[in-house]
């Protein structure tokens, strides 16, 4: 690792460099080669010409590109030729003594020293002509000539325009021609109108049953409540009742063309026979049960006992209803009838608790 990289620089570094440069020996190479490079005074004339030319160039910038020079004699003046003077180079003499400072000249001295040229009075006609270039004026002149020639040629082709009034015969002939043209146009119009009517599609009427759906806005139906009004007999004013405006609602209607279509979409259901509900003779309530012997409906167990007690009393007094039937029918009863009667008797003889 280099120690010089980490070392801090000295405070007096570079103090003697200016003295070494001043004590440096002059080299003869710069004095002999190419005639020497020592500077010589004597360029005052060159500097004056250059400053004058620079002033002239600056003044030219004020003129627009499209404007022509104000005076014609300025173009005839000979242009000054700039010459470049090359002299031998001489090394400047280095002096240890400080050079005295020159007083600064005011910047506007050169501008004031220049003689001001008297301005020529402006001429409107000259300025307007000089603002346009020669090429522009030439093109404008040629265009004007071409337009004029075309106008002359068009007048020659048209010939003289005669404004002679027409005679009565000429007017009648012209009216006949106009009439024929109008008749032809009318015939064409009628033919086109007939063709258009043929092409119009006629509305087809639906054959057969139809169903029409119609929706509309209708006023809302409200219930009218009658209010009692107190009538004043003495002739005082009656109290006016407030009328509330009813709202509106939407209603839809479906219309069928015939009854058959309506019945096909909305068939009528067959009404069945309504079964009459039995009523208990004891409690006068809807019966829930039925006695198998007497075939009397009853509501609960209490009603059932009352019905059976009445049935027993009827048997003791009047006898069985099947025995009475047997006496009326006589002894020629079939065996089947006897068997059924016996079964009934056995069935009736079993009392239910």
Swiss-Prot record:
Domain of life: Eukaryota
Pfam families: YL1, YL1_C
Regions recorded as binding DNA: 155-205
Listed InterPro entries: Vps72/YL1_C, YL1_N
Bias (Basic and acidic residues) ranges: 70-79, 113-143
Compartmental location: Nucleus
Region (Disordered): 1-143
MF-aspect GO terms: DNA binding; histone chaperone activity
Keyword Lipid metabolism: no
GO BP term (any one): transcription initiation-coupled chromatin remodeling
One term under GO cellular component: nucleus
Function noted in UniProt: Deposition-and-exchange histone chaperone specific for H2AZ1, specifically chaperones H2AZ1 and deposits it into nucleosomes. As component of the SRCAP complex, mediates the ATP-dependent exchange of histone H2AZ1/H2B dimers for nucleosomal H2A/H2B, leading to transcriptional regulation of selected genes by chromatin remodeling.
Family: Belongs to the VPS72/YL1 family.
Subunit structure: Component of the NuA4 histone acetyltransferase complex.
Listed name of the protein: Vacuolar protein sorting-associated protein 72 homolog
Organism: Xenopus laevis
């Amino acid at each position: 690792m280099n120690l010089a990289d980490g070392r801090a620089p000295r405070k007096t570094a570079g103090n003697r460099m200016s003295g070494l440069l001043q004590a440096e020996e002059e080299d003869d190479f710069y004095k002999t080669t190419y005639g020497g490079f020592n500077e010589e005074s004597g360029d005052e004339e060159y500097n004056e010409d250059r400053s004058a030319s620079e002033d002239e160039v600056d003044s030219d910038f004020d003129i627009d590109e499209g404007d022509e020079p104000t005076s014609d004699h300025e173009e005839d003046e000979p242009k000054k030729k700039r010459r470049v003077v090359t002299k031998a180079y001489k090394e400047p003499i280095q002096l240890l003594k400080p050079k005295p400072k020159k007083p600064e000249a005011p910047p506007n001295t050169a501008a004031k020293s220049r003689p001001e040229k008297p301005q020529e009075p402006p001429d409107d006609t000259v300025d307007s002509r000089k603002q346009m270039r020669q090429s522009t004026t030439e093109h404008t002149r040629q265009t004007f000539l071409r337009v004029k020639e075309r106008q002359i040629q068009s007048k020659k082709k048209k010939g003289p325009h005669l404004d002679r009034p027409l005679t009565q015969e000429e007017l009648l002939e012209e009216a006949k021609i106009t009439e024929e043209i109008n008749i032809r146009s009318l015939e064409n119009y009628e033919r086109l109108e007939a063709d258009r009517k043929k092409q119009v599609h006629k509305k087809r009427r639906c054959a057969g049953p139809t169903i029409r759906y119609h929706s509309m806005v209708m006023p809302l139906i409200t219930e009218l409540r009658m209010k009692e009004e107190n009538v004043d007999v003495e002739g005082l004013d009656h109290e006016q009742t407030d009328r509330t405006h009813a709202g509106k609602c939407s209603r839809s209607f479906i219309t069928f063309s015939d009854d058959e279509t309506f019945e096909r979409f909305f068939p009528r259901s067959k009404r069945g026979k309504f079964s009459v509900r039995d009523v208990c003779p004891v409690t006068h309530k809807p019966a829930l049960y039925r006695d198998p012997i007497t075939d009397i409906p009853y509501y609960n167990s209490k009603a059932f006992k009352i019905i059976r007690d009445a049935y027993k009393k009827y048997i003791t007094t009047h006898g069985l209803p099947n025995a009475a039937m047997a006496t009326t029918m006589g002894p020629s009863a079939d065996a089947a009838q006897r068997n059924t009667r016996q079964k009934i008797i056995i069935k009736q003889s079993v009392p239910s608790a």
